């Protein structure tokens, strides 16, 4: 009999800082009429890092929701929604050096210019 190790949370138990697999669950209530979640298969979601917070936001202004992610020892990570497939976006030079110990992320139009701004906190 073989035992499979199940990982949960943001790290592999006993192996900090090795991150566990990240995944996105889709609520299938509209399609099924029942409370059921399905795992969304996407290679860019699997090895993000030790995710601690995320938010849905139209980062690129194309009228669909992208995913913005932060975590322990992670840079700000943007998963751009391209036809309901989330693609990890290459960050601009000013955002590439955002690696930190992030635990919170909020999106809001702080300067009143009509687009969302992001606040990351540790």
Q: Where on the chain are the PLM-derived regions?
A:
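Beta-propeller-forming repeat regions
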Residues: 1-122
